[in-house]
Amino acid sequence: MSGPAIDASPALTFNQSSASIQQRRLSTGRQMWVLYRRFAAPSLLNGEVLTTVGAPIIFMVGFYIPFAIPWNQFVGGASSGVASNLGQYITPLVTLQAVSFAAIGSGFRAATDSLLGVNRRFQSMPMAPLTPLLARVWVAVDRCFTGLVISLVCGYVIGFRFHRGALYIVGFCLLVIAIGAVLSFAADLVGTVTRNPDAMLPLLSLPILIFGLLSIGLMPLKLFPHWIHPFVRNQPISQFVAALRALAGDTTKTASQVSWPVMAPTLTWLFAFVVILALSSTIVLARRP
């Protein structure tokens, strides 16, 4: 008597399930690539690329020329030990301002898609809710990379230099891009909620400028009024600038070193922003557009 036949259906089911998962991954990748091309193509014609290139130049000129004389008179120039030159001091802030303005494009695209009902059509498709958002952020991160490169070139012209090894240079660039990605994600959520493309520039640029001016990116903490020292010292832009200066290094004896006390506040701010944005995205994307 022959033994009972073995049912092969579980193995088939497992294989089919694995193939289905792999197919979904490939489908999501293709969807992101198609959406990336859709979002990136108009930016080549609407002036966004020109703005991405021009913003770092304008910021560098706008910060360097007015602060060149006060830098020598009130800070003390290179002899003060604050920084070897003004270019070394302000370039980290300019890189942050550049990627911040590049991130605004993600909010503009999200607001436009929400206003025109494109997000509603996306929701009716077999597509993960995060896919359009991540595609828009992908485009913004590309623009952030462009802004970073232009900022470093401008900084090099006025005296900025990296004084540490290649690993620190990579860390500097990755930190700037990570900050740009977080800001792009936040701008996208704001644009999705407001559905007002015209409001994106003032709504997102004013906080960036205010926090940048009230930071140690332009002048040392001692030159601010005492009553605002706690805010200036602890706000995220100041902490980001301090971390970037440590990664860039300097020739002065008082140059910040890359250490846990210097980097921890920056990593804490980034982690807090990621948590807040993750929670916010679940609420925003769960809404019917």
From Swiss-Prot:
Annotated GO biological process: daunorubicin transport; DIM/DIP cell wall layer assembly; doxorubicin transport; lipid biosynthetic process; response to antibiotic; transmembrane transport
GO molecular function, one term: ABC-type transporter activity
Annotated GO CC locations: ATP-binding cassette (ABC) transporter complex; plasma membrane
Disulfide bonds: none
Record's subcellular location: Cell membrane
Residues annotated as transmembrane: 49-69, 88-108, 138-158, 166-186, 199-219, 266-286
Membrane-related topology note: Multi-pass membrane protein
Keywords: Antibiotic resistance, Cell membrane, Membrane, Transmembrane, Transmembrane helix, Transport
Record domain ABC transmembrane type-2: where: 47-282
Physiological role: Part of the ABC transporter complex DrrABC involved in doxorubicin resistance. Probably responsible for the translocation of the substrate across the membrane.
Family affiliation: Belongs to the ABC-2 integral membrane protein family.
UniProt miscellaneous comment: Was identified as a high-confidence drug target.
Assembly mode: The complex is composed of two ATP-binding proteins (DrrA) and two transmembrane proteins (DrrB and DrrC).
Protein name according to UniProt: Doxorubicin resistance ABC transporter permease protein DrrB
